[in-house]
C-alpha cells in the first residue's frame, strides 16, 4: 500500500470516527436507534447463549413462552459469532467499536482484492477500496446499527472468484464458499447478488463459464441448506406481500396479514433512498429519507470508464445496472419497474423484500470497479494524481458531511438507573415492564440486567408475538389493566386477585415503570407524549402497593412481596417532578 492511499484512508477514518475515539469504550458507534438496540441484544445473546449451547429458542423475552430468535429474524447469526471474541475480550462497547473498525478495514481489503482481478495497480486498488469503505450506503447501515449489512468482505471475495470462475475448479469452490458466507451473513445479499451474477455469466463467453458458475451456485446452496431448511419449509413466514395485487404494471404495499408496509426504494436523481407509503385514501407517496449516493462517486465512475479495459467495463456494468434496477423498487418517476414487479410476484423469497434499495450495496461495488481505472490512467502524472486523490477524498467527505453521515455519532452504553438497580437481583426473576411497547430500547437494557421480560422484540405486532402472550394481554385483567393504566387509560374491567396471582405463578417478581415516556418532550422522538405521571403512579399503586425502589428514571414494585433488588446500595435519589396534564376524556386519567 502506497503513502497517498494510506493517507486518504486515514483522512476518511479520522473524519468519520476521530471525534469519538476518546470515548471508544463508553458508548456504541451509531445513533440511539431501534436497530442499534436490537443488534446489541443479538450480540449479547449470541455471545452468552448460542455459543454455549447452540440453542436459538429463548424465553428471555415473551417469558415464559419464548421465541425462536433466529426464526423470528431470519437466521443470520454470523456477525454475532464474529463479534463475540471482541466483546468477550474488550467488553460490549469497546469490543463492538473495534469490530466496526475491523469492518471498515476488511471492506477496504476486499475491494482491493476484487480489483486485483482486473490488473488494476495496487495504488489505485487501495485508494478505491478506501473510498468504497466510506460510501454512504455502508455508513448509513453502521450509523443505524446494522453492521450485518455493512460487512462486505465475503461478498467482495465472492465477486472476486465469480469473475474468474471459468479459470478452474479452485475459484469455483471459493466462489461457492464465499456466496454461502454472504448468505449466512445476510440472506438478502446473496439473493440480491443474483441478477448481477447472472448478467456477469451471460456476457462471459469463456469456455466452461456457465458450467462452473452453476457448480459454484449449487455448492453454496448445499452449504447453507442446513441453516435455511427450517425457513424454506415453514409456512409461517410473516410479512409476505399479497401478490394477487401485483402485475407487470401494478403493485400494492399490503401484506397477506393485511398490514401496509413502507417499501424502501432508491431515487437516483435525488440520490436518496426513501419509502413508498400509501395514504388511507390509497395515494402512494415516495418520501426521501437519506442520501445513498455521492456526486463525486458518479464523477469518478464516469471518468474511470474512459480508461477501463473491456473486461472491467463489462463486469462493472453487469454488477451496477441490475443492482440499480432492483434498487429502484416498484416504480420510478411514475414508470412501473416491470422486471422488479414480476420478480416479486413469482419468486416467493422476494415477497418478503420490503427493502429493494438494499441492492445498492452492489450498485456501489459496480461504481467502485468502474472508478478504479481512472487512477491508473493518471499514472504518468503522479503529482496530479495525488492531488486529485486528496481532492476526491475532500469532496467525498464534504458530501458525507452535508448528508449528515460523517462524523458517525455515538450513543452511551449507560442504562437508566432503575434498570441498574434491577441488575443487582442475582435471581434474575422475570420482569413486567411498563409502559408496554413504549420503546425497543428495553432490549438493550436487558443485556445489562439479564432478567426475562414479558414483552420482547416487536412486541406490539401480533405477527411476531406468541399467541399465549397475546391472550395474556387481552384476557388477564391484571396484565391488561396495568398496560392501560400506564398508558393513562382506566381499565375496562376490574383487576382481579386471581389474575394478579396468575402472573406470580408464572414466576414474575418485579413490575418496572420507566418514567422516560412521561417527560415532556418524550425521551424518544418517535414516542407519543404522556404527561400525567402523578395520576398514573397513584392508580398503579392501588394494585401494586408501595414501590420498593424509585429514582428519577423509574419505579420498581414487588407486588407479590420482596424488598428492593438493590437494597444494599445507597439510598436512591429523590424522584424528580414531572409535568402533569389531566385529560379525563375517553377514560383517560
Each predicted region: which residue ranges?
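Start-transfer (signal-anchor) and selected internal transmembrane alpha helices
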Residues: 1-22, 215-219, 306-316, 387-389, ...
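Periplasmic/ER-lumenal interhelical loops and adjacent helix-loop junctions
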Residues: 33-49, 225-305, 348, 356
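Active-site lumenal/periplasmic loops and adjacent helix-entry segments of GT-C-fold
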Residues: 20-118, 123-156, 280-282
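Hydrophobic, aromatic-rich transmembrane alpha-helices
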Residues: 202, 219-222, 293-326, 374-377
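Extracytoplasmic
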Residues: 243-252, 287, 394-589
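Signature aromatic-anchored transmembrane alpha helix within multi-pass, membrane-resident enzymes
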Residues: 198, 214-222, 369-401
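Membrane-helix boundary/interfacial segments in multi-pass membrane proteins
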Residues: 29-32, 138-149, 249, 285, ...
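Membrane-embedded helix bundles of polyisoprenyl
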Residues: 9, 99-118, 123-204, 217-220, ...
